[in-house]
């Protein structure tokens, strides 16, 4: 529930009671999501607090990034550093994704988009590709009820060619289950590439022009945006990449045109909601000019 101080509104959830359930306990895999009290008075359930019991920093509503995009990088390196197979890093990243979802709700973010599998990832070994596709399917199946209880709206974003039908099926079920939720919208980018998205939009517009449905001279940015995978995804405010790498990697090229970039050194399996909050605090200190002086 948002609080008001003076003329400013703070959307952060208040600190949880000390005995409120915590997450994540990484001693087992899959990481177990704790039982949390059901929401009351038509509200959704409050997310479990972090195991550290840290609370989200107070940031005024007009300074909280509305849309945060995250490149979840470093799973393979995390596993290699520990003498494990790359897939073990991906497994440990599942709990981090759920944890930052909880943290995003606590701090007041309304849109979260995560890069789970790129169109370039098909170049990886057949074994890893098969694992990642199956893993995405199982994560959605395993976590959608927990996320639904917290008011999360789940959506898949990506290209259909080459995408496993079984993965699309699980996303479709999750989207139908959560379609009316309004606490936060999470876009899971699987088989997604920014250039591919733009090319597919251009192709659709070109076909409409050939069919005489539109005048090419009247094509605008707004018209183009309507042909992207999800026309209602807002522009990215904060773009986060973990693992210390500093590049966009073909992610949300159109939507992130004016995003603020924060690069954090932690590998994804070591990341948690406190790191997300730190990125939000850095975002607050940025001067967004949008081309103005």
UniProtKB/Swiss-Prot annotation:
SUPFAM superfamilies: Undecaprenyl diphosphate synthase. It catalyses: (2Z,6E)-farnesyl diphosphate + 7 isopentenyl diphosphate = (2Z,6Z,10Z,14Z,18Z,22Z,26Z,30Z,34E)-decaprenyl diphosphate + 7 diphosphate; n isopentenyl diphosphate + (2E,6E)-farnesyl diphosphate = a di-trans,poly-cis-polyprenyl diphosphate + n diphosphate. Disulfide bonds: none annotated. Pfam families: Prenyltransf. One of its GO terms (cellular component) is plasma membrane. One of its GO terms (biological process) is polyprenol biosynthetic process. Keywords: Cell membrane, Magnesium, Membrane, Metal-binding, Transferase. Its EC number is 2.5.1.86, 2.5.1.87. It comes from the Bacteria. Homodimer. Belongs to the UPP synthase family. This is Decaprenyl diphosphate synthase. The lineage of its organism: Bacteria, Bacillati, Actinomycetota, Actinomycetes, Mycobacteriales. The gene is uppS.
């Amino acid at each position: 529930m948002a609080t008001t101080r003076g003329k400013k509104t703070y959307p952060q959830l208040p600190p949880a009671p000390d005995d409120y359930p915590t997450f994540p306990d990484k001693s087992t895999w899959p990481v177990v999501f704790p039982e949390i009290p059901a929401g009351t008075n038509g509200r959704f359930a409050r997310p479990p607090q972090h195991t550290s019991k840290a609370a989200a920093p107070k940031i005024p509503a007009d300074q909280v990034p509305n849309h945060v995009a995250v490149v979840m990088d470093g799973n393979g390196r995390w596993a290699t550093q520990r003498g494990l197979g790359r897939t073990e890093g991906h497994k440990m990243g599942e709990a981090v994704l759920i944890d930052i979802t909880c943290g995003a709700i606590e701090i007041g973010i309304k849109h979260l988009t995560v890069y789970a599998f790129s169109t370039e990832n098909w170049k990886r070994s057949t074994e890893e590709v098969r694992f990642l596709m199956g893993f995405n399917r199982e994560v959605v199946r395993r976590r959608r009820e927990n996320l639904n209880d917290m008011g999360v709206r789940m959506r898949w974003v990506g290209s259909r060619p080459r995408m496993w039908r079984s993965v699309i099926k699980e996303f479709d079920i999750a989207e139908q289950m959560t379609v009316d939720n309004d606490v936060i919208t999470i876009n899971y980018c699987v088989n997604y590439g920014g250039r591919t998205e733009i090319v597919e939009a251009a192709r659709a517009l070109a076909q409409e022009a050939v069919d005489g449905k539109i005048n090419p001279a009247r094509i605008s940015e707004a018209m183009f945006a309507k042909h992207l995978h999800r026309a209602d995804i807002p522009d990215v405010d904060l773009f986060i990449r973990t693992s210390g790498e500093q590049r966009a990697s073909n992610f949300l090229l159109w939507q992130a045109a004016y995003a603020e970039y924060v690069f954090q050194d932690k590998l994804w399996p070591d990341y948690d909601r406190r790191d997300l909050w730190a990125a939000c605090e850095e975002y607050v200190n940025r001067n967004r000019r949008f081309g103005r002086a």
